[in-house]
Amino acid sequence: MDTSSINAQSIFDDNAATLKLSWLTGHEGWERGFSSESVANATSSADLVGHLNLIHPNRIQVLGDAEIDYYKRQTDEDRSRHMAELIALEPPFLVVAGGVPAPPELVLRCTRSSTPLFTTPMSAAAVIDSLRLYMSRILAPRATLHGVFLDILGMGVLLTGDSGLGKSELGLELISRGHGLVADDAVDFVRLGPDFVEGRCPPLLQNLLEVRGLGLLDIKTIFGETAVRRKMKLKLIVQLVRRPDGEFQRLPLESQTVDVLGLPISKVTIQVAAGRNLAVLVEAAVRNTILQLRGIDTLRDFMDRQRLAMQDPDSQFPGKLI
């Protein structure tokens, strides 16, 4: 991942209002950031932001009340040595939290070394939690997929398929049935956690749906505020296909999944043909997926009943084993 755009200046600009940050000194080091190696080796954002720790270099160091009190109890020699070690680590920047004054020696060393030094009245714990959440979003794996992303019955569903199969028309019908639009054509997905992928609409395409023959439709203006969503977790992919008779698997014995940012996402394939009510089929697929997430598998239950019936000697099942 390219980390060149993540530096002290960008982090300050994005969080100054939320964290009430003030840039005390070290403005010349605005380009300081994280090395690619430190980001690659980080198991989570906790490795990139934390309380003062001289063992972990190249991370955002936050000094709270406890760290400042410890500093004050040290001898002049120990203070100088600790400050020298801290600056030598070349952290992206330092934050003195809790509204306590920054030690004069720390300010002087940050000025001389062009190390950005921020201050905030907020507690160190609040600053660390907020910056960790921010870093996890910034550095999360991302991908842009083609399709129509909808909120159907509270589940994030991505409609995919070849061009011309009617994905946008199907999306429009589902919206008219009370479901919500997240994004059309291009959907930005980001993996924010170990078990979920979140999808959003690019700002340029917000609330828009393109339908052949009608052009661009502003869904929010036409259907109202409740017809659009800002984001949804991706739980199901519905792939629309057009295949000749005899080439479509009616009862797939194995659950289909698609890898999205390293996470397997359930997939359902629906054949497009004249006379088929695709909106009803998609809704049924979503309801069935909800049952499967609750541990209810209709096909597996049927196969279990079939096996028991075939093994029962008193059963009138026509295909029982003799």
From Swiss-Prot:
Keywords: ATP-binding, Kinase, Magnesium, Metal-binding, Multifunctional enzyme, Nucleotide-binding, Serine/threonine-protein kinase, Transferase. Its cofactor is Mg(2+). It is an enzyme of class 2 (transferase). One of its GO terms (molecular function) is magnesium ion binding. Its EC number is 2.7.11.-, 2.7.4.-. The keyword Ribonucleoprotein does not apply. It catalyses: [HPr protein]-L-serine + ATP = [HPr protein]-O-phospho-L-serine + ADP + H(+); [HPr protein]-O-phospho-L-serine + phosphate + H(+) = [HPr protein]-L-serine + diphosphate. Pfam families: Hpr_kinase_C, Hpr_kinase_N. Residues 209-218 are annotated as: Important for the catalytic mechanism of both phosphorylation and dephosphorylation. Catalyzes the ATP- as well as the pyrophosphate-dependent phosphorylation of a specific serine residue in HPr, a phosphocarrier protein of the phosphoenolpyruvate-dependent sugar phosphotransferase system (PTS). HprK/P also catalyzes the pyrophosphate-producing, inorganic phosphate-dependent dephosphorylation (phosphorolysis) of seryl-phosphorylated HPr (P-Ser-HPr). The Walker A ATP-binding motif also binds Pi and PPi. NCBIfam families: hpr-ser. Both phosphorylation and phosphorolysis are carried out by the same active site and suggest a common mechanism for both reactions. This is HPr kinase/phosphorylase. The gene is hprK.
